[in-house]
Amino acid sequence: MDASMSFRVQNGLMYGVGNKGGIYTIKIPTGTQDVVVTKVSQLQYALNGTNFGVDFNPAADRLRVISDNGQNLRHNLNDHTTIQDLNLTTPPIEGTTKGVSAAAYTNNDLDGTTATTLFDINTTTDQVVIQSPANNGTLAPTGNLGIDAGINAGMDIFSTLSGGKTVDNTAFATLTPSGAGTPSLYTINVFTGQATLVATDAAKAKFPLNITDVAISLTGT
C-alpha cells in the first residue's frame, strides 16, 4: 500500500497520508536535511486500495483521498472529520471505477472568487479524467496519456499566480511506462490527456527510486 502527499494552500505545509490513514505534516527545517514528520490527524475510514491519490481542495480546504479501488474520501483537518463520498464511477459504465491512482486540483490560490477542478489519472484506461462533482465521484475522460502507465502514479498541479489569483496551471505526473523499473516525470495536458517527458533526454526525467507520488511546492521551488 502506497502513501501520498500534498501541499495545503491555507498554510503552505506539506501533508502526507500514511498507509494506515494517519495524516502527517512533513517538514525539513532550515539548515538541516533531516525530515520531521508529525501526526496531525487521522482518517475516520480505513483506506481501501493499494495506490492512492491525495490533494487539497484549495477552495474548500478539504483533503481529497481517492484510490485504485474506487474509494473517494474528503477530510477536514480543522475538526478531524472524514466524509465517505460516493465511489468513483464513469457513466454510462455501471459499477465502481478501478485503477484511478492520482489526483490534483487546479487553481491553488486563496482568492475567494476562484473555482477549482479536480483531475485524476486512470492507469487502467491510461486516461486523464475530470472528477465532477467531486463528492459524487463522477468521472469523465478528457483524453489518453499516450503511454501504457503502471498503477503506481502521482500527479500535482502548479498554479502560477498574479495578484494572488491563478493565471495558469501546469500539471505534472509521475508515471511508470510498461517495462520501466521506476517512474519518470511528465507534464500533463489535462484537457487532451497527453503526457510529455519533462526532459528531451529520457534518462534525465527518470527517477532513481520507485516513488509513489509528487508534490510541488506552492512557490515552485
Regions found by a protein language model. Give the residues of each.
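Glycine/small-residue-rich interface belts in oligomeric ring/scaffold proteins
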Residues: 1-42
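Structural signature of eukaryotic scaffold interfaces centered on beta-propeller domains
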Residues: 3-11, 45-61, 95-114, 149-167, ...
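Conserved beta-strand positions in repeat-built beta-propeller and related beta-rich domains
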Residues: 8, 14-20, 56-58, 65-68, ...
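Repetitive beta-architecture junctions, highlighting loop-to-beta-strand starts
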Residues: 12, 21, 35, 61, ...
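Structural motif
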Residues: 20-27, 70-76, 115, 124-133, ...
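Beta-propeller fold detector
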Residues: 33-44, 77, 81-94, 130-148, ...
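Hydrophobic alpha-helical segments and helix pairs
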Residues: 38-87
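A mid-sequence, solvent-exposed acidic-amphipathic segment
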Residues: 104-156
